[in-house]
Amino acid sequence: IHKMLNPRSIAVVGASPKGGYGGRLLNALLRSKDRVNIYPVNPNYDEISGLKAYKSISDLPEAPDLMGVVVPYDKVLGVLKEGHAKGAGSAVIISAGFAERGTDSGLDLQRQVGAFARESGLRVAGPNCLGLANVRDDIWPTASSRTLGGLTGHIALVCQSGATAFGPFLLRAVDAGIGLSHIISTGNETDLDFSDFARYLIDDPGTRVVAGFVEGFKDVQKFIAMAKLAAERGKPIVLIKIGRSESGARAARSHTAALTGADSLYDAMFKQYGVIRVSDYDELLEVAQLFAYSRKPRKPGIAVVSHSDGINAILKNFGWAANPADVTGFARGQHFPTIMRHMIDEPTVGTLVVASAGGADQVPQVIAMRDNTEKNVAYFWTASRADKDTLTTLKKSHIPIFYTPQKLAQGLKSLLRYHAWQDDCVADGAAQVPKATEEQMSALTAFQNAGRSALSERESKEVITAWGVPAAREVRASSAGGAVEAAQKLGYPVALKVDSADILHKTEAGVVRLGLRTADEVRQAYDEITASAKRYAPDAVTAGVSVQEMVTGGVEVIIGIQYDAQLGPMLLFGSGGVMVEVFNDVALRHCPITPAEARRMIEEVKGAKLLRGFRGKPAADIDALAATLVRVSQMAVNLEGRIAELDINPLMVLPVGQGVKAVDALVVLKTLEV
């Protein structure tokens, strides 16, 4: 990657004097020909754009650090092999015609290119990309028609879409005066992907922020490892993740699946690993700029100085400007620096926001304040962007500029949350996953071997108890008399439920009876449940009923597992019970989690108030709940590839010191066609 981003010799394979991608790539590189050896390669020409053209890569006078490949797709693999034989350092494949065609042949060819890149060590960006740019050194190996100098800064832009990277992002960065260190389009990512480039940029001293535009990740574990390292190094990752639509989601068998959409899983993962997600091009650049040119806030307080009380009123609506000052009449006077100093020196203030139209005398005063304080300064521009002189001065000063109160508020919130998260992340350490024991795995193996799609409640509890999750005591009964005997053994009151893997949501089927206190009630409940089961699912296989102890005096919560095709195991926690999908009060995390992360999950849920004791109720055993969340997250990793979903709903969190008990559980096996 270093040679790719810092080349001193570049071969343009497929260079052309006729325009097109080959012509644009060569023309973009001509600006750096005084610093980089540029070699056009095309057997049909002796000279292109004033440079000697070569018949083949083998004819080059040196092994190029980078090959820009612009040849028909069926010639690309041959070019890579020839380049490898020459000793080329890397390649950017502009050529299209691979997996994006949607054909088996295109996908197969792309796989061959990727396999060769990994086996040979000739690392590849693309195919189907627009190239890249080392903006800092003004080297632009890109087939984009847009190349601009003088835009140097500390933000690296990595996009899976080349048209987006060199189109709206580049144009907006120029318009906003936001400098970049690199622009990288990754295309189809047959070899190097977003995470690889971001990992390299974490080590780049000239890059302070990695900004990205992605649709998905080839290797989520690699992305997570990169994000963790970025947090340790203090380099924020700011992303637009497209594809928020939930269309095409599979039918949900468990409550957990119904409560989690694909996009909510990404949101949870980003939050867990400190990735700042934004919504649009402007927000990405403005937030990245704020991080690139701001320190860690010493205090969370934000002071706002404005020439308009109306602007202050607008900013107050966003909930973070507690002390706005209307300085009408002083905004352009000699007293303005004193006012700013008074505001920024407040002990609770970590950031000063100046909201103004940017007068010619005021802007230098704001810049001077930024240069003479260790606190952060940002600017909310309230005038027309056509007022170029003072706005240009602000841009050149690298004071973060925002143009809407919404994006200003979002940016400042992101800054505060990121640094708070970073402190927590460093303190947490790594999540642990003990290797599953033979006894734990055998709890599931028998059911899988039987070709089952889901487990009954009783069977599901056998699985979770193997991972240390306590469950309510129960006895299976196949007759009304047997149910009475079981109830007497457990002690009244009891609950009766049908024992069947074919009836997953028992409340809906009418096959649950609670709080039974006498033998007569148990007999009646048995008859009603068996009749209801036959009406609800005539073909269901049942094994009688499960007679369970009634667990009372606790708070109902749900813990669940879902496996995403890209993200892997995800853990859900929320307020539980039969209304769980109505309230949708949940927190999500990627598995495994640390004990501290478990407690943060608990605090995210509105129902956490009930756990702390509410209206005279005793406080619940939050320590036991947090430990259970950790164990279930470890279980999720251990059972990846073997189960599809897990619900523990409800899990009763009993008063402090009494632990937790699973009252109901559902395991959906991986073999289920969904």
Where are these regions (language model features)?
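Hydrophobic, well-ordered beta-alpha structural blocks that scaffold small-molecule cofactor pockets
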Residues: 1-35, 40-42
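General beta-strand structural signal in soluble alpha/beta enzymes
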Residues: 39-41, 91-93, 117-118, 123-128, ...
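Phosphate-bearing ligand-interacting subdomains
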Residues: 52-116, 213-219
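Periplasmic-binding protein-like
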Residues: 64-70, 90-93, 156, 208-216, ...
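Peripheral docking tails and interdomain loops at the edges
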Residues: 86-88, 95-152, 238, 242-311, ...
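Active-site nucleotide/adenylate-binding loops and adjacent lid/helix of ATP-dependent enzymes
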Residues: 144, 282, 288-294, 433-555, ...
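Short glycine-cluster motifs
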Residues: 146-203, 248-251, 271, 298-350, ...
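ATP-dependent carboxylate activation and anion-phosphoryl transfer catalytic cores
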Residues: 260-261, 277, 388-392, 396-403, ...
